[in-house]
Swiss-Prot record:
Induction comment from the UniProt entry of this chain: By hydrogen peroxide.
CDD domains the record matches: catalase_clade_3
Organism of origin: Bacillus subtilis (strain 168)
Location(s) in or outside the cell: Cytoplasm
Reactions the enzyme catalyzes: 2 H2O2 = O2 + 2 H2O
GO cellular component, one term: cytoplasm
Protein name from the UniProt record: Vegetative catalase
Keywords: Cytoplasm, Heme, Hydrogen peroxide, Iron, Metal-binding, Oxidoreductase, Peroxidase
Taxonomy of the source species: Bacteria, Bacillati, Bacillota, Bacilli, Bacillales
UniProt keyword Oxidoreductase present: yes
Cofactors named for this entry: heme
Residues the record lists as binding heme: 337
Amino acid composition bias (Polar residues), ranges on this chain: 1-23
Active-site residue list: 54, 127
């Protein structure tokens, strides 16, 4: 007789898991069959809400090893010495697709890393591109609505996509990247990752710098052409997920080098554009890459739901020595991500094994749905108190910085949406430009209103006249004389 007994969720042995309890062989099923009721009820509740963005994803465990001394820039403990290793979990994803969507579509890829440090978890929640479509979080719900399905037809709507982009010229840099060869990575292993936003590092003396993160793939950058990507999407929609899993399973561990760009605090006041604008990159001639360490992925998840689906990341998950910047998009994400996790996974999502800090969590938060640890036990549950409860550590406060201005709804004061998009276009080879234009033309052909196409062409033209002319020719449309 097997010692591996099937049990109910409350631990009692199950006598029959093949036949419902009925009144005779042909009689009705009995409500007293509590095992049947529990089994069906749990099945009805197996799904949690799908992520509103980045729903389709793959993940892996690994480690980060420091390869260069950066202690003069940050006091973060996990970066404190060369050779130090920190365990991590990463989740890659597409942005717009649903859980069952194809991997090889034209879409930015999420690149979210959770470091399990001795000072708590630290998340870098970025993409495989260094910029984004918008720079103020107030526009994010509208932007994502255009990327998702039309509420009337339940179909993707190219008119909505290009209408929004053409009315949001700050998107041009990211649109150019998306429509280029880089828009469809060959695999998750063959793409770079970026923190995208500007962050602040502070050292033990309280001295700060602005930084940007760059993860450079050691596998080399490889992309898919449109026809190959479409073929794979039809034959194996989980191609990227499968490739990552198989590579790690076969011992072919993917790795990335982490670099930072470092900007002195005072340069933010004089740089030629706002360094907190996530639609722009910092020139590497001005702020060269400095190596920090190496990330290696060497272990697959044991259970997709428990680890990849329930993993939660937020740019607000910070550790001492690393702070945020005034980037408006980043500031909105500080709220939105944690709030999304509270809705999707629950108020105590950070206590789940995949999200739980490796050091002791010590605070006065109590109760809430699915509180499954000791809930603080019998310890003091308020602060201040006279019973030896946990105390704040003033030395770990976020670094102070001066602010000024009038409280108002204010746009960014830099309106050059075209220089960097044009620079990127001119950096491309002739073949790369041809494919870029073909991708844009094919994506814009279904747009219903000609005025939307003309408006977008004008943006391309302002970035580079050749860029605009070639798109216009592909669509059979004129260039505005005043462009």
């Amino acid at each position: 007789m097997s010692s591996n007994k099937l049990t109910t969720s409350w631990g009692a042995p199950v006598g029959d898991n093949q036949n419902s309890m009925t009144a005779g062989s042909r009689g009705p099923t009995l409500i007293q069959d509590v095992h049947l009721l529990e089994k069906l009820a749990h099945f009805n509740r197996e799904r949690v809400p799908e992520r509103v963005v980045h729903a389709k994803g793959a993940g892996a465990h690994g480690y980060f090893e420091v390869t260069n001394d950066v202690t003069k820039y940050t006091k973060a403990a996990f970066l404190s010495e060369v050779g130090k290793r920190t365990p991590l979990f990463i989740r890659f994803s597409t942005v717009a697709g649903e859980l069952g969507s194809a991997d090889t579509v034209r879409d930015p890829r999420g690149f979210a890393v959770k470091f399990y440090t001795e000072e708590g978890n630290y998340d870098i929640v970025g993409n495989n591109t260094p910029v984004f479509f918008i720079r103020d979080a107030i526009k994010f719900p509208d932007f994502i609505h255009t990327q998702k399905r039309d509420p009337k037809t339940h179909l993707k709507n190219p008119t909505a996509v290009w209408d929004f982009w053409s009315l949001s010229p700050e998107s041009l840099h990211q649109v150019t990247i998306l429509m280029s060869d880089r828009g469809i990575p060959a695999t998750l292993r063959h793409m770079h990752g970026f923190g995208s936003h500007t962050f602040k590092w502070t050292n033990a003396e309280g001295e700060g710098v602005w930084i940007k993160y760059h993860f450079k793939t050691e596998q080399g950058v490889k992309n898919l052409d449109v026809n190959t990507a479409a073929k794979i999407a039809g034959e194996n929609p989980d191609y990227h997920t499968e490739d990552l899993f198989n590579a790690i399973e076969n011992g072919d561990y993917p790795a990335w080098k982490l670099y930072v760009q470092i900007m002195p605090l005072e340069d933010a006041n004089t740089y030629r554009f706002d360094p907190f604008d996530v639609t722009k990159v910092w020139s590497q001639k001005d702020y060269p890459l400095i190596e920090v360490g190496r990330m290696v992925l060497d272990r697959n998840p044991e259970n997709y739901f428990a680890e990849v689906e329930q993993a939660t990341f937020s740019p607000g998950t910070l550790v001492p020595g690393i702070d945020v910047s005034p980037d408006k998009m980043l500031q909105g994400r500080l709220f939105a991500y944690h709030d999304a996790h509270r809705y999707r996974v629950g108020a105590n999502h950070q206590a789940l094994p995949i999200n739980r800090a490796r050091n002791k969590v010590n605070n006065y938060q109590r109760d809430g749905q699915m509180r499954f640890d000791d809930n603080g036990g019998g310890s003091v549950y308020y602060e201040p108190n006279s019973f030896g409860g946990p105390k704040e550590s003033p030395e770990d406060k976020q670094a102070a910085y001066p602010v000024q201005g009038i409280a108002d709804s204010v746009s960014y004061d830099h309106y050059d949406h075209y220089t960097q998009a044009g620079d990127l276009y001119r950096l491309m080879s002739e073949d790369e430009r041809t494919r870029l234009v073909e991708n844009i033309v094919n994506a814009m052909k279904p747009v219903e209103k000609e005025e939307i196409k003309l408006r977008q062409i004008e943006h391309f033209y302002k970035a580079d006249p050749e860029y605009g002319k070639r798109v216009a020719e592909g669509l059979g449309l004129p260039i505005k004389k005043d462009s």
